[in-house]
Amino acid sequence: MADNLVIVESPAKAKTIEKYLGKKYKVIASMGHVRDLPRSQMGVDTEDNYEPKYITIRGKGPVVKELKKHAKKAKNVFLASDPDREGEAIAWHLSKILELEDSKENRVVFNEITKDAVKESFKNPREIEMNLVDAQQARRILDRLVGYNISPVLWKKVKKGLSAGRVQSVALRLVIDRENEIRNFKPEEYWIIEGEFRYKKSKFNAKFLHYKNKPFKLKTKKDIEKITAALDGDQFEITNVTKKEKTRNPANPFTTSTLQQEAARKLNFKARKTMMVAQQLYEGIDLKKQGTIGLITYMRTDSTRISDTAKAEAKQYITDKYGESYTSKRKASGKQGDQDAHEAIRPSSTMRTPDDMKSFLTKDQYRLYKLIWERFVASQMAPAILDTVSLDITQGDIKFRANGQTIKFKGFMTLYVETKDDIDSEKENKLPKLEQGDKVTATQIEPAQHYTQPPPRYTEARLVKTLEELKIGRPSTYAPTIDTIQKRNYVKLESKRFVPTELGEIVHEQVKEYFPEIIDVEFTVNMETLLDKIAEGDITWRKVIDGFFSSFKQDVERAEEEMEKIEIKDEPAGEDCEVCGSPMVIKMGRYGKFMACSNFPDCRNTKAIVKSIGVKCPKCNDGDVVERKSKKNRVFYGCSKYPECDFISWDKPIGRDCPKCNQYLVENKKGKTTQVICSNCDYKEAAQK
């Protein structure tokens, strides 16, 4: 029997660590939190200094029993949950359930799950850091007080199943504020003039810049006519050439927020998926002969700091692969996170390259690991050097300008370039070699009318970035917050951008009217600052809670008395119930919209909303192929005659048969291209854009 018991959150993490520690250690998983506030009641005594009432989470009884059995037999119990506030709280709850000594040095933390890091952490166990626990408790109790007081009011006055929360309500506000900006936006006319110029055999483009040596706004067609009237023929002169060398530094290694943003843009991953895959990489991958190893450092962090050991290893790799000139000469600029002395997200070893790891990883694991690895290695590489040139092209009072750039030294761009929501500006644009006084010919002068555009709706990446910039929430809260406002049907995705629903706007208006603090950005930011102060030991958690609740409970009382009941009318479905003849209406359920009888509860008939794709079922040739959604919201195709016909396909049938085997053809999407393939054999048609 092992003398030492180690408790971690997950079986995957337990399996990895046990291999490192040897036979004297037994490592078991708590399966996350074992204690929490009860779901059936508030669980916070507002009359007794906000004392929380923690209970064993439903279904965790057998886990707790197993933990107690092993703890009783062990000489030493070590708590090795994750190295953040949440992990510290899990360790504290475990110590209470197992009745461990408060002053016992039994807490071990490591930022990466590698043999050296884990063994080193066990040489330096410490006491549970109660300031971190209290910061987590304060957040949990705050969220419980808000949710359990506002939600019943919304259920009573608006609709059952609604919720509001400190972070989710601000996230919803951001989406709605942006939508209102778009609705209120008044487009303004403007024009641009682009010219195509020729010098010898080279052609290049330039834009109108000045009229009579001053900026001249092209607001209307009259302005255009004024400029075109001033032009005299097609001959222009180069009146100024400005050459500069520009340095572009690599982006810092990932934080939680920047990882979620970049994975959304480059890999099309949702925030929740990014965190799930990152957790797998952190907790350990079976590398066969090398054993199970955590491939990345802890993935919930707001720090860009890198350890000296990791920097040295990256420098060695870069020197060997690219040469000394590609290594960074800059001093470290990484920021320390607000939550503890974490590092940025990086590979646990630069020497474990994505290509070497590919055979051990799933497709998603490989893509995310490659992104993390390349971003980190690039962050330790030399800047890129760009040669820029600006040409002023003049005729009389009219001046055009052409800007060009070429890459002189690629540096980090050899490996990795950060993407943006908008078009990146790092593309090469070569201009012919021209000197002041050279003559060029205009081959085309083209005015174009434009209108100003409203601000774009939020993508998931942009919403995460905005939440981080405003200091709303923490690395661990971004993904669940975005998930919640979608599950509650407060927002929906259209073309990968968030649009508020009618329900979302109704809930927002009520929260805005009766609980203004909850959606106030400054209030939410100040609360995060107070939580940080609790973690640093500068203020007690009870004082923070009391400062909030004393005014909040008055808002709750006012809302209960004054908020008017709002009736949300169901959308007509346009057909009658086949059971009782009453009109069918469209309802919103857990997995999206569905049809239900308006005569509920007397009639409980429901139907899925199906969308025909205009193709006959290839199996029965009687029903139509309709688009449906799985419980995980994935689109699939079935027969309208179901259950009589059980045809099903993940790919969209196109209504034609394969010329090779006569089975049905489908559209198969791979990234940004769509291919027509056979559902049965290897027949393929050319990819379509």
Curated annotation (Swiss-Prot):
Q: Which SMART domains match?
A: TOP1Ac, TOP1Bc, TOPRIM
Cofactor(s) essential for the protein? Mg(2+)
Zinc finger regions, C4-type: 577-603, 617-645, 658-681
User: Source organism's superkingdom?
Assistant: Bacteria
- Which residues are named in the active-site annotation? 298
Annotated Toprim domain residues:
3-113
* Residues annotated as site: Interaction with DNA: 33, 139-140, 143, 148, 155, 300, 488
Q: Where is this region: Interaction with DNA?
A: 163-168
As recorded in UniProt, its EC number(s) are 5.6.2.1
Query: Which Gene Ontology CC terms are recorded?
Result: chromosome
Task: Tell me which Pfam families the record gives.
Answer: Topoisom_bac (PF01131), Toprim (PF01751), Zn_ribbon_Top1 (PF01396)
The record's similarity note reads: Belongs to the type IA topoisomerase family.
Quaternary data: Monomer.
Q: What is this protein called?
A: DNA topoisomerase 1
Q: What is the lineage of its organism?
A: Bacteria, Bacillati, Bacillota, Bacilli, Bacillales
Q: Which gene encodes it?
A: topA
